[in-house]
């Protein structure tokens, strides 16, 4: 359960020896090793909708591993992408433990939604995970999350009986068109649209205030007359192709299942479903190139991590840390890999033969050479690029007004939300 105010405001310094949650707020120190005194520990855990069954099994395993404590753990639905949105207005009303994508870590910290790790929890997290994942949990000189996945990126899935040349977007679209099938791309999703802009060389850079909690300035050239225009034209061309279908996870999985889709861009979380649909024709590889006005570009992508955050407003802070550590531990990362082929951040599992032989993870690794780390993303990026993508899909962005639309997007990205 969550309280509107940290319990420390009421009893810190008065019942210092027993008020565990209160100590979490006194002085801002780490309390991840404190043991709660309550008989029944009540926690709320947020996770993606498609992971609810698996999370229920993980919670059962957690309870079995801690038989001397009585837990009441409630599951809630919140995708990793939506964690900051749900917590930004009132983190005290949020879950005790929640999953999030690493690009949100600064904003989550800014609104006070992340408890700092310390003691054995910190040392275990740092020793078990890869360097990139550990750094994704870091803000300044502290660590504020538990990594559980290093596969937050995307690549190409395809039916190899239909698509035989995956080197270029044109070749993929032509193969789909000839076979009367579709290529699915989430063109009104900023996360995927970045592939075109990064591919043509567009960049951004955020300068933060000294405490890391606010944007001081944002530089961005997504509206560049050459690079930005090339990316925009590529998106316009894709949206106009008869073999293109705009869609996300549900559309591409349904399309592979019924045979109407022959290629799609997504991540490892859909590997099991797509492989089940395609069988022997299942294949995956890095993203293709695209050509605009005679110049060929390699599609880029975001590369990121997924982590568990612990809400400092938890009434059972130490137990919330214990749950987050368990869910991100080696055994549960192994379960995620076996259930959804989610790429582990745990170094032992990542080095296993099963992971090395995985088709989707191999494709993700190949795409990694062209990926941009999903860190320090401007706060205005997501809504601005999504709006541009929506307009491309609606065909209200044309070659004639492209520069104007790009400038509107660029100005929105460069705006500093906290100024």
Where do the protein language model's features map onto the residues?
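Conserved N-terminal structural module of periplasmic/extracytoplasmic solute-binding proteins
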Residues: 8, 19-20, 26-104, 411-419
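A structural signal for short loop-to-beta-strand junctions that line the ligand-binding cleft
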Residues: 88-89, 93-96, 124-158, 181-185, ...
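Hinge/lid segment of periplasmic solute-binding proteins
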Residues: 102-154, 167-173, 283-286
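Ligand-binding "clamshell"
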Residues: 108-116, 140-142, 202, 274-297, ...
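Extracytoplasmic/periplasmic solute-binding protein
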Residues: 144-148, 154, 172-220
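Glycine-centered hinge/linker elements that transmit conformational signals in sensory
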Residues: 212-246
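Conserved C-terminal helix/tail region of periplasmic/extracytoplasmic solute-binding proteins
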Residues: 365-419
